[in-house]
């Protein structure tokens, strides 16, 4: 109950008189067993949980006996993970929000016309953060400096702002921070993204996580998405590594799948070739487990510290 998630999904289940199935630890075999035993229909978990289920032993052969809807958020699940979950019989619903917005501000509602798309394209659309949630009055992407609304063209990147009855009034005993977050009458999320023509917002990065290399802005999420498509990659996080010439360059921390031939650093960099611009490709890759908070979020501030100390190339760590 210490997390904003506890204000939403937990009470919704109680209100309709449904049954809670509580898992004390993320053990894929136990989760699958409980889904079957209790006839679970809904599951809520961070992308970390989806990763563990999608890449657990035998998951590629597993098929659920009944459909299970999953609400996930906190980070963008990769299209690779979404495809793996869908193949098992899960329906992935991606949401986006903050504690300051009392949980979800957007939901990626599935559109019927997506069913005709090939699976990679469908998963890509499902990985977006989605359309304005019913409790949110307004949701826009604006120029961070001027507050001007940017066009909904899927390419104009700005800060995601929102307002509505479920947005907080302010930070306790911190009027300065409150004024800063509500500049222009909107709540400033600090997240950078684009608005698509269909009204769906897509998160590109936290403002502090944007990598500026040679004057070019690089979205760490874009690099992560492409690396996550590699068949040996279980999960990945990309941060900026200081560089004396370029200012910053992308540094990727990669956790590998078990039972799959491990790629080399050069092999992963070559994987990126042709899928992204040259300046966006990671120049440093570290193989390791990713540090996380108690709620499963990747601690990028720790990775940024690790990146400063990482050598030019690192075949394996940890």
How would you name each of these model-derived features?
Residues 2, 29, 33-37, 47-69, ...:
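Adenylate-forming
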Residues 2-41, 56:
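Conserved AMP-binding/adenylation subdomain of ANL enzymes
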Residues 18, 36, 68-70, 77-95, ...:
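Conserved AMP-binding/adenylate-forming
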Residues 24, 38, 57, 137, ...:
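Structural motif
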Residues 38-40, 60-64, 109-114, 254, ...:
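Short, hinge-like loop/turn segments at secondary-structure boundaries
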Residues 43, 164, 169-170, 180, ...:
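AMP-binding/adenylate-forming catalytic core of the ANL superfamily
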Residues 69-72, 238, 284-287:
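Hydrophobic/anchoring residues in structured secondary elements
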Residues 307-318:
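Acidic/polar alpha-helix N-cap and adjacent early helical turns
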